[in-house]
Amino acid sequence: MSFTVELPKDKSSIIKVIGVGGGGGNAVNHMYREGIEGVDFFICNTDAQALESSPIPNKIQIGNALTAGRGAGSNPEVGRKAAEENIKDIIESLGVNTQMVFITAGMGGGTGTGAAPVIAKAAKDMGILTVGIVTTPFIFEGGRRCDAAFHGIEEIRESVDSLLVISNDRIKEIYGNLPISKAFGYADNVLTTAAKGIAEIITIAGSINVDFEDVKTAMSDSGVSIMGMGLSEGDDRAMRAVNQALNSPLLDDNKIQGASNLLVNSSYGDEEATMDEYAQINEFLQNEAGRDATLKCGLCYDDKLGNGITV
């Protein structure tokens, strides 16, 4: 297997999510199971076994001539060459209706670190709004992996419109001595929250909508971005949710002061958001960011929230 894409052009979404390498693939598998409204999922890897075991229907094996399907051996240069070997396949997949793509990868290994910047550059060169969501390694994974991650982040930063960097190492600081699988699971949840939060601003019809052009204006060539999410219910739920969002523990440097653009998506459940709550959220964020920041704000219903509100 080298190339399996099941996307009829008339049914393809304008938003694609591509998981690159082992870490990116695991994250996108998780996203796929959790569900993100109105996006198409892809997985891209040198490792044929990882592709075979993934539930994602759209799979691109890269670098088969180079690695014979055995992975990149933690060598980013192999990952880069593998992506270049199959760049036409990647471009062909992205050419189906795509206006926005999320590229997720774990930085520090071979395929994700090396291939993700190549794929991102191809997407951006096609005029697609390109958003990178990447993780940095745990310190215990070793200095060499951390160094590779640093260089990988510098490379992908040059190839995307917007980059979100999620620190795996902060998981241990915040949550303590977790089982390994649970620690990586927390990171997958944050990746999912980031992609879902941005994509569903566009794809879910709400009481107040943010359209694709608003998102494009906010994120085109915006550099490093940050994101947070909060959920609360009961008294003062709106302010507690927005404060949680601004203190999201797994995103580095989550300060919005001086930001030029803010995308704000608030959702409510059975208890509809009031005008005062909507105003509280947006006015608080405007004050935190500064009066020069442009806010694009959406509001929608989510039947899973009960009496809660999310920001």
Map each language-model feature to its residues.
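Tubulin/FtsZ superfamily GTPase core signature
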Residues: M1-V311
